[in-house]
């Protein structure tokens, strides 16, 4: 069984809440096998940032993310994994191979800022720029350094999931591994063999069959050329297209 241990920042919840909800569903794997064990870590930064977005910017996605985190925490801590409202209306069973950790504020006091800077090896200029960061980003770095570098468990490797370019930059400067929601979703969907992965594989196979030429771009990625008359569209759900 593959294990994935994700530190989720505010942008991961705000822009990828639907993905996170799907990961938590017990019926994500069509053959019923447990191929994935998930651990989610929610830093203090994430909760504070989502609260700020909810009240100052009236962000609906931030509000929904906070509600979901609260439901998830209650369900995982009390063992009430049946009939958790993952979507807006539909009740789902929460997967049993899922752990949620909400950060204790005391952890931030245990990690000093000089400790965080000790993991930056890019020179004094980078350290100076880190020293000028807003407090909220320093708090996030403390959380990530603790989970990725200081926690006494070599068996677990934590990865920060973020959609924020600035967070990605400062994470790299402190040697904190990170990935995007799309990257995380692609890996988990493949392991769970869920519908989104199967549809993607089906579409890619169709493109390969109908392609007339293959080449590589400057980044080394494969490019498939097709005839205009044989345009392949992504699969869509059944139903009538809505028109105003």
UniProtKB/Swiss-Prot annotation:
**Does this UniProt record's set of keywords contain Cytoplasm?**
yes
Coiled-coil zones: none
Ordered alphabetically, the record's keywords are: Cytoplasm, Nonsense-mediated mRNA decay
Q: Name one GO biological process term.
A: nuclear-transcribed mRNA catabolic process, nonsense-mediated decay
Q: Where in the cell is it found?
A: Cytoplasm
A cellular component term from Gene Ontology for this protein is: cytoplasm
Q: Which residues does UniProt assign to the signal peptide?
A: none
Give TM regions: none
Bridged cysteine pairs (disulfide): none
The protein's job, in short, is: Involved in nonsense-mediated decay of mRNAs containing premature stop codons.
* Name under which the protein is recorded: Nonsense-mediated decay protein 4
